[in-house]
Amino acid sequence: EDGVLSEAEITWLTRRAKDGFGVITTAASHVSEHGKGWSGEMGVWDDSHIPGLTKMATQLRENDSISLVQIFHGGMKAPSELNDRIPVCPSEMKDNEGKIVARELELSEINDLINDFTNAALRVEKAGFDGIEIHGAHSYLISQFLGVKTNRRNDQYGGSIENRFRFLKDIIISIREVVSKNFLIS
């Protein structure tokens, strides 16, 4: 529940490497304490996650696998029951009865989230992984920025496709500026 990697997850992925998988990508790992999409999910939002990540990266490398950690934020799909707060989204979202189910992100929060993705990538690199996969599908936060129904913003992060893409672009640029040249970003 605290995002620390379990022995079962390490064993499961290491077994894939021992079986000859050349590239191993972890399950989605939340970059923010309040971005968890489901119970028991792996986290990369705190330095306390680095020891477990290091153990996994070492075991995968010892079995000749390239290793990536998939990073994401659940956005409006981060249940309030798990995160103790109303979910966030590029724009406010309401259910059919008009109840707010996700609140709109402030610009300062968007910048904080870009930093969360960047810091998560740094933790992944410090742990010894070969790279990250930025999860931008399945209606999670990045996908919500790209969508016209979930992103009705009137600022630099909304409107045109170029603006809706800006959140992901800013994440990639920010990460690339701080990780090593050979660190993979997919």
Predicted features and spans:
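Active-site neighborhood of glycoside hydrolase catalytic domains
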Residues: 158-185
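Active-site-proximal loop/turn and secondary-structure-junction residues that shape catalytic pockets
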Residues: 30, 73-75, 136-138
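Non-globular sequence segments
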Residues: 58, 66, 72-129
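Aromatic- and acidic-residue-enriched carbohydrate-binding clefts of CAZyme catalytic domains
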Residues: 31, 44, 79-105, 145-165
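Generic beta-strand/beta-sheet core signal
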Residues: 70, 135-137, 143
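N-terminal capping/small domains of soluble enzymes
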Residues: 1-72, 113, 121
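Alpha-helical scaffolding segments of alpha/beta enzyme cores, especially the outer helices
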Residues: 55-58, 119, 170-177
